[in-house]
Amino acid sequence: GNAFVVSLALADLVVALYPYPLVLLAIFHNGWTLGEMHCKVSGFVMGLSVIGSIFNITAIAINRYCYICHSFAYDKVYSCWNTMLYVSLIWVLTVIATVPNFFVGSLKYDPRIYSCTFVQTASSYYTIAVVVIHFIVPITVVSFCYLRIWVLVLQVRRRVKSETKPRLKPSDFRNFLTMFVVFVIFAFCWAPLNFIGLAVAINPSEMAPKVPEWLFIISYFMAYFNSCLNAIIYGLLNQNFRNEYKRILMSLWMPRLFFQDTSKGGTDGQKSKPSPALNNNDQMKTDTL
């Protein structure tokens, strides 16, 4: 399961390394100055990040659903080899979903948001396909998975104490809650832009002029800001991530002390802190009351 979280983090990180700095440069120069190639590449990378994020969030929801609701089959379905295969498939599908931008000419500079991005009016059919693939289908799948998990959680809480009846471990519930919040924040940040895109695609000539510029700008920057939120959510809801964040900050503030502690930990034996995992597949998935 952690492989999907790392993959999601990669999708969030890639926009911070390339497209976002170019957006800042465009704001500074009040226009795009880097040429068409950088424009198309940055728009393509942005698309990879966006679609890769929702595909990974969907994969995490399915993973949590199998882990909690079908625990007996989990280890077989999500073996190490299968998990790597699933992650690879996610990124292959992400590339397949993003490449058509080059053929429909939908990657252009938009001065309202100072970035090269997907133009919703370039192709109505492709815009509808993007909204369906990027938003509607994933939201439906993730909603089903988390609804089933919530039903199980409620059923477990209502059970009478018994040595034979399983219950969820608190750590499993916290991990599920963390990823559920990630999903809710994603849906909240991306819903306005997708609904605008769908409305414009259905009737471009009538709907495009009716969309207020302020609403379009706010919806775009809400979507952009989503990539920055996941790390904050992990830190707020997961103790292991908070510990690792503290270690990173300590290493930046007092690197000498940090490396001394690291060296000391290595000589004291196998006492290193656990990685900031969101789940632990080596533990039993059920427990008794």
From Swiss-Prot:
Region annotated Disordered sits at 264-289
**TM spans, by residue?**
3-23, 42-62, 82-102, 127-147, 180-200, 214-234
Topology feature Cytoplasmic, residues: 1-2, 63-81, 148-179, 235-289
GO biological-process terms attached to the record: G protein-coupled receptor signaling pathway
Tissue specificity, in the record's words, reads: Brain and kidney, with trace levels in lungs.
Question: Which GO cellular component terms, listed alphabetically, does the Swiss-Prot or TrEMBL entry include?
Answer: plasma membrane
The UniProt record lists the keyword Disulfide bond: yes
The source's domain of life comes to Eukaryota
Intrachain disulfide bonds:
39-116
Where is the signal peptide, in residue numbers? none
Output the Gene Ontology terms for molecular function.
Answer: G protein-coupled receptor activity; melatonin receptor activity
Which keywords does this chain's UniProt record carry? Cell membrane, Disulfide bond, G-protein coupled receptor, Membrane, Receptor, Transducer, Transmembrane, Transmembrane helix
Q: How does it sit in the membrane?
A: Multi-pass membrane protein
Query: What Pfam families does the record point to?
Result: 7tm_1
Extracellular topological intervals: 24-41, 103-126, 201-213
Q: Does the keyword Cell membrane apply?
A: yes
Localisation = Cell membrane
Role, per record:
High affinity receptor for melatonin. The activity of this receptor is mediated by pertussis toxin sensitive G proteins that inhibits adenylate cyclase activity.
Query: Which family, according to UniProt?
Result: Belongs to the G-protein coupled receptor 1 family.
Output this protein's name. Melatonin receptor type 1B
What organism does this protein naturally occur in?
Gallus gallus
